[in-house]
């Protein structure tokens, strides 16, 4: 188990060496802008994905977390598309679709498009500084990344694990007195079966 306070997470963001573990894709922006590099984050660790994503934003890159199962060939194709097509001027980060049509596709978002909605979203789902949410999955999926950042935005606690064992999930849920769960329906069914 790894635990981070907000201060430790901030220190990890500042000290993250994103250039050694992720792929930088340069592109020529349509207009003059400081943001001309997309960082394709390739890491299996949820915590490292989060730290690198936040560090990339902090350092002026446009981060995009690659799905864990993406092969090198597709990442190369994605890098070529980004390099040749660029990204919208308003883009602060990229997310990938789930790939239901065969291959994940990039979607470009602005920080504002999320941050302006967090308070509304958190109110709807009763998320605040006392929230303890369990979630399972990769930070590369937009629902997971949105929920993590929304909970951190409110000052809440995020609990996750790389374990695929529902019994481990239940242990963590009980240990940390989790009051919210965010998971795909298939994972929720697994969880219910083991309760």
Where are these regions (language model features)?
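Conserved S/T- and glycine-rich ATP-binding loop of Class I adenylate-forming
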Residues: 39, 56, 97-100, 133, ...
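Conserved AMP-binding/adenylation subdomain of ANL enzymes
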Residues: 118-132, 140-180
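Conserved AMP-binding/adenylate-forming core of the ANL superfamily
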Residues: 1-33, 72-75, 85, 109-112
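Adenylate-forming
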Residues: 164, 178-195
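Conserved AMP-binding A3 loop
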Residues: 92-119
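Short hydrophobic alpha-helical segments of the AMP-binding
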Residues: 52-57, 114, 147-152
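Conserved AMP-binding/adenylate-forming
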Residues: 18-69, 135-139
């Amino acid at each position: 188990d790894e635990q981070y306070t907000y201060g430790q997470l901030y220190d990890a963001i500042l000290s993250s060496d994103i250039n050694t573990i992720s792929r930088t894709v340069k592109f020529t922006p349509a207009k003059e802008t400081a943001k001309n590099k997309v960082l394709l984050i390739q890491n299996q660790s949820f915590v490292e994905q989060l730290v690198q994503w936040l560090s990339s934003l902090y350092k002026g890159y446009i981060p995009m977390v690659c799905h864990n199962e993406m092969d090198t060939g597709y990442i190369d194709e994605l890098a070529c598309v980004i390099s040749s097509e660029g990204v919208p001027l308003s883009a602060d980060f990229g997310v990938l679709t789930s790939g239901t049509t065969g291959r994940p596709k990039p979607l470009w978002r602005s920080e504002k498009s999320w941050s302006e909605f967090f308070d509304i979203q958190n109110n709807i789902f009763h998320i605040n500084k006392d929230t303890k949410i369990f979630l399972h999955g990769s930070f590369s999926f937009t629902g997971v990344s949105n929920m993590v950042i929304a909970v951190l935005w409110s000052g809440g606690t995020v609990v996750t694990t790389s374990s695929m064992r529902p019994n481990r999930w239940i242990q963590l849920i009980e240990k940390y007195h989790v009051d919210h769960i965010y998971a795909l329906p298939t994972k929720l069914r697994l969880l219910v079966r083991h309760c």
